[in-house]
Amino acid sequence: MKSHRYIRRKILCITVVLLAVSQRTAPASKDENSRTESHQRAEVILLYQRNSGGWPKNYEREEKLSKKARSKVLSEKNKNDAMIDNGATHTEIRLLADAYHETSDNRFRDAAIKGITYLLAAQYDNGGWPQRFPEPRGYAKHITFNDNAMIGAMSLLRDILVDHKRFPFVSRDVRAQCGKAIESGISCILKCQIKVNGRRTVWCAQHDEKTFQPRKARSYELPSFSGSESVKIIRFLMQIDQPGKQVIEAIDGAVTWFDHSKLEGIKQVRVEDPTKAGGHDKIIVKDDNASPMWARFYDIKTNDPFFC
């Protein structure tokens, strides 16, 4: 009997130990994994933040950096490559705000505030944003709608202004600055809108920072009506509460242009082409049943679509 009781006690002890170990080594839940990934991503974002407060574009936010790679990134803190192109800076600020909400790590909060300060400082007095700041050169100094740059920055500032739950750490004074920046940005948008015979149409991907006229960027980004960036601009304007007469006219003019400029009876298809990068190309073919589509660029003088 004594032997049996001893065995039962040993089994009970082993069971308790195994249970404890299994609890410690159990797979993390989906929420825990998500929080861990968010935290790791925020750490990478901290590394890449420039001393100006902004971020460069196209680095890998999910990257797991070696010691050598971390040292290299840290050595580039003074690099003048911070910008708002391709989602840079305004995306990082959102991710840092989320990471701070999950972890209460003040480093994420402080970096987000520094990024917001960067965006406010980067805005021109006329309300526009250059693609790159500080000391923008070449086409990077133009007022940049290309790839959602200016609208991405303005959308973030608008969210900071109204979403106190996501951005509780932003002071009342900074929120007020965000509000003024948005108003100034809207004024700039209206000044940039291209007029033809006195009628409002749409926007170019980039505009002159002094005259507001359409401007060229890269070789294939010519002064033109943009069938892409203009969509994002209109959506932003449509979200304005109680818009003024000028904003309503801007939206109506742009919508009319889109209606007149739609392309019917054609569609874009992907074809194999080993001579092209990725082994494929895109071509336009006739199709009477195709849904309407719009070109990325339209000639300002003729309103004809063109391909570069």
Where are these regions (language model features)?
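Hydrophobic h-region of N-terminal signal peptides that target proteins for export
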Residues: 16-24
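Low-complexity, Ser/Thr/Pro/Gly-enriched N-terminal "stalk/linker" regions
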Residues: 27-79, 196
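CBM-like carbohydrate-recognition segments
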Residues: 55, 195, 199, 256-308
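Long, well-ordered core segments of solenoidal/helical folds
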Residues: 40-53, 111-128, 179-198, 250-267
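Well-ordered alpha-helical scaffold segments within catalytic/enzyme domains
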Residues: 29-33, 41, 46, 90-105, ...
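Bacterial N-terminal signal peptides that target proteins for export
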Residues: 2-12
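Eukaryote-skewed repeat-based solenoidal scaffolds used as protein-protein interaction platforms
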Residues: 109, 113-116, 120, 137, ...
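Solvent-exposed loop and edge beta-strand segments that line ligand/cofactor-binding
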Residues: 30-34, 74-89, 137-150, 216-229, ...
